[in-house]
Design a protein with these regions (language model features):
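A structural boundary/capping signal
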Residues: 1-155
Length: 155
């Protein structure tokens, strides 16, 4: 279902071809070495639901790794709802593996499946500079625009 939305949005010219790349998320403990897992275990209770960008930026800054911006399609466990299914989302990458601290440590909605489509990677310094100049952080990529577009397709 989610790939149908993307194909239609590309066909309609709403999203450029090649702008989204499906990626696979690996459990955090499988992506990180012992010292990184220890650093993350000290942080994980402070991760906040619906704050994926902040959670990913803090992880990136602590572990010196990139933030990955994109969109995700959520299929909740029986009966729970997620507005539209598509969300703008941010996760991390280390040694070629993608992992999502927000899903693992902060989401309260039980998720049956979650599909990830990456737009761009950014260094944590880019967000730190944004924070210093504007007082906040926002998605740098077109993740917000693309999630809005995809939520308007019926598939």
């Amino acid at each position: 279902m989610c790939v149908k939305h993307i194909k239609k949005a590309i066909k309609d010219g709403e999203i450029p071809k090649g702008a989204l790349r499906e990626i696979r998320i690996t459990p955090t403990r499988e992506c990180l070495d012992t010292s990184d897992n220890q650093a993350l275990s000290l942080m994980k209770t402070s991760f906040i639901e619906r704050s994926c960008l902040m959670n990913s930026c803090r992880t990136a800054s602590t572990l010196n790794i990139p933030c990955c911006e994109g969109v995700a399609f959520i299929i909740p466990e029986g009966g729970a709802t997620v507005e539209g299914g598509w969300i703008r989302h941010c996760w991390n990458k280390k040694n070629g593996y993608y992992f999502d601290v927000t899903r693992e440590y902060a989401m309260s909605v039980p998720v049956k499946e979650m599909y990830y489509f990456m737009i761009e990677e950014h260094k944590s310094i880019e967000y730190e500079q944004q924070l210093q100049s504007t007082g906040g952080i926002e998605f740098i990529s077109k993740a917000v625009k693309f999630s809005d577009i995809l939520n308007n397709y019926d598939g």
